[in-house]
Amino acid sequence: MTIRSPEPEVKIVVDNDPVKTSFEKWAKPGHFSRALAKGPSTTTWIWDLHADAHDFDSHTSDLEEISRKVFSAHFGQLAVIFIWLSGMYFHGARFSNYEAWLSDPVNIKPSAQVVWPIVGQEILNGDVGGGFQGIQITSGLFEMWRGSGITTELQLYSTAIGGLVMAALMLFAGWFHYHKAAPKLAWFQNVESMLNHHLAGLLGLGSLGWAGHQVHVSLPINQLLDAGVDAKEIPLPHEFILNRDLLAQLYPSFAKGLTPFFTLNWAEYSDFLTFRGGLNPVTGGLWLTDTIHHHLAIAVLFIVAGHMYRTNWGIGHSMKEILEAHKGPLTGEGHKGLYEIFTTSWHAQLALNLALMGSLSIIVAHHMYSMPPYPYLATDYGTQLSLFTHHTWIGGFCIVGAGAHAAIYLVRDYDPTTQYNNLLDRVLRHRDAIISHLNWVCIFLGFHSFGLYIHNDTMSALGRPQDMFSDTAIQLQPVFAQWVQNTHAAAPGFSAPNAAAATSITWGGSELVAVGGKVAMSPIPLGTADFLVHHIHAFTIHVTVLILLKGVLFARSSRLIPDKANLGFRFPCDGPGRGGTCQVSAWDHVFLGLFWMYNSISVVIFHFSWKMQSDVWGTVSQNGVSHITGGNFAQGATTINGWLRDFLWAQASQVIQSYGSSLSAYGLVFLGAHFVWAFSLMFLFSGRGYWQELIESIVWAHNKLKVAPAIQPRALSIIQGRAVGVAHYLLGGIATTWAFFLARIISVG
């Protein structure tokens, strides 16, 4: 950290009225492009319109103008999110059984959608308990509302209205900061100020505000609900906030006010700031006093972090200095030049953020079941499965997006003159070694992981179970994972002496937690089957990374096409007369990476779904625990045939037999999504010329009848066809999985 003489204060950097508001301009499709603004001559126009509408790089090369468009679009995105959230809360207020669910969250299922009887589809309104007919939802919103202290539908209405007000504010802000007071480029590039405000403001004060809400509103309300007090008898939130005596009745330290805080006698507050670990046995969720403690600690950390970077006062860190000082003995110029990349290429910035955000989303997926944060979330198996699946899919898409934008950065924004012998340059220069080694790793993982499975299938087929890899024959125990589990399970009383229980029940060493006769969470034993599946995970993830990384590292040039950078981010082939140069653009690598991402995530969510049904989820009685699939994972998941027979086929019976029941929509979606998936193959396995010939024949027939269209029909380009193909492939696959999972888990869970 360096202290300098104070630098001149940062001036307010905006341009006033830079772009006039014009409805005439907005009403003209393609107004952002000279070519598109002329209007359509062929059907390709509508595809190009969609491809380029948000590709601000193609509208202008002025970085300031691009930055303003992105900034303004973010406000539009926030407005959409607020409207969507408002709709969720409105459904909770108007069409849901939330108040009934609050009274008996174990036996009544959450529902916030009632189907109107138009052509007999009111069959979809299943009996969710508590005298309510509707569609069972698996979003986890009821549990979140309960955890935040919402007890009435009026509160949900009010929040929904608040969401619409915020949406209006965001729409106004998007217009204002583009048309009235648009920030200058220097403002977008002022990273220290941005870090300070985002860290201290968004994350720090955001967490502090949430901790405050949890202490003064959520905690007393949840405490009373847990004790069995009727929601209608509980004081309203503002009464707890304004009347300290109400809180002091539940938490005696409130009577002392802020005295313990200023006298540093903080232990006084340990009645509502705890470090217990484990789960609340009443709700099956994390202890609310633990999560309050967590948010308070996070707030302190981030508020401190938000004072670390040098702005007007000449004190603190400079990102440029930190990066340029970051040199090792083996890495040349180290991070020199990276500051310039991240302040002039928003694609590079976005790639980094997407990679981190995607990884974080997958980490969230794993914590949502192992440390369920909301009351009664853990016993709502449909919601648990949905949340895990959702967060892993989101993570997968974000990580592929990171590969896409990293490649776009290299094609459009990379400046070789400023990148000499720094880390990026060095990685690009030994890309052949990186990719060939990664390729070897993929081959090794692929042959060995599938080799173990094929060995097992062969032995099983030959009737030699004693020669299989399984927990009852040749064991391949995941010893490192078991060591990690045991270390965490032993931490309370050993390396974490102040914790009452381990961070998660899943580590083992403790009893399972059951709520209302349903298992909330139990230790998760790992065995040979998990070892085998784990190596399939390693294989699919490494292949996804291989495809994306090859696309990035060879985005500008390769031995095959040395001038690739001149062809752009997406191109079908390197022109006529150069056979074997198709499917080499950076875009094609993203296209191929998406399929492997789909492979990766599918295996992950199948593993999770079956493992939980087999070893965790179930009911508790005097005779012990009865799991949904009776612990069949350890034997079934050791062969490919077992996955097909004992998981896919055995668990598809609910969705296949759903006709005539309230789950029949899932049966239709299962069928329809299979069709959407199959439809994608028509685009993926077909050549452009085939369709062009067909179109010309059809156009000839129209000309004969004198009904020829003014806009000339054209076949999709190769890239457009692939984009349509991969979109339907993923959409069909995801919707099929969704219907399969939900029909199954709502039936048996």
From Swiss-Prot:
Arranged from A to Z, the UniProt key words for this protein are:
4Fe-4S, Chlorophyll, Chloroplast, Chromophore, Electron transport, Iron, Iron-sulfur, Magnesium, Membrane, Metal-binding, Oxidoreductase, Photosynthesis, Photosystem I, Plastid, Thylakoid, Transmembrane, Transmembrane helix, Transport
A single GO CC term, please? chloroplast thylakoid membrane
- Tell me which residues bind phylloquinone: 691
Membrane topology designation: Multi-pass membrane protein
What sort of enzyme, by top EC class, is this? oxidoreductase
Q: Where are the transmembrane segments?
A: 70-93, 156-179, 195-219, 291-309, 346-369, 385-411, 433-455, 531-549, 589-610, 663-685, 723-743
Q: Which reaction does it catalyse?
A: reduced [plastocyanin] + hnu + oxidized [2Fe-2S]-[ferredoxin] = oxidized [plastocyanin] + reduced [2Fe-2S]-[ferredoxin]
* UniProt remark on cofactor binding: P700 is a chlorophyll a/chlorophyll a' dimer, A0 is one or more chlorophyll a, A1 is one or both phylloquinones and FX is a shared 4Fe-4S iron-sulfur center.
Query: According to the UniProt entry, what is the EC number of this protein?
Result: 1.97.1.12
Q: What is its main location?
A: plastid
Positions contributing to [4Fe-4S] cluster binding? 573, 582
Q: Superkingdom of the source?
A: Eukaryota
Q: Where does chlorophyll a' bind?
A: 674
Q: Where in the cell is it found?
A: Plastid, Chloroplast thylakoid membrane
| Binding positions (chlorophyll a) | 682, 690
* Biological process (GO), any one: photosynthesis
Q: Name one GO molecular function term.
A: 4 iron, 4 sulfur cluster binding
Record family assignment: Belongs to the PsaA/PsaB family.
Q: Which PANTHER family match?
A: OUTER MEMBRANE PROTEIN, OMPA-RELATED (PTHR30128), PHOTOSYSTEM I P700 CHLOROPHYLL A APOPROTEIN A1-RELATED (PTHR30128:SF19)
Quaternary structure annotation from Swiss-Prot or TrEMBL: The PsaA/B heterodimer binds the P700 chlorophyll special pair and subsequent electron acceptors. PSI consists of a core antenna complex that captures photons, and an electron transfer chain that converts photonic excitation into a charge separation. The eukaryotic PSI reaction center is composed of at least 11 subunits.
Describe its function.
Answer: PsaA and PsaB bind P700, the primary electron donor of photosystem I (PSI), as well as the electron acceptors A0, A1 and FX. PSI is a plastocyanin-ferredoxin oxidoreductase, converting photonic excitation into a charge separation, which transfers an electron from the donor P700 chlorophyll pair to the spectroscopically characterized acceptors A0, A1, FX, FA and FB in turn. Oxidized P700 is reduced on the lumenal side of the thylakoid membrane by plastocyanin.
Q: What is this protein called in UniProt?
A: Photosystem I P700 chlorophyll a apoprotein A1
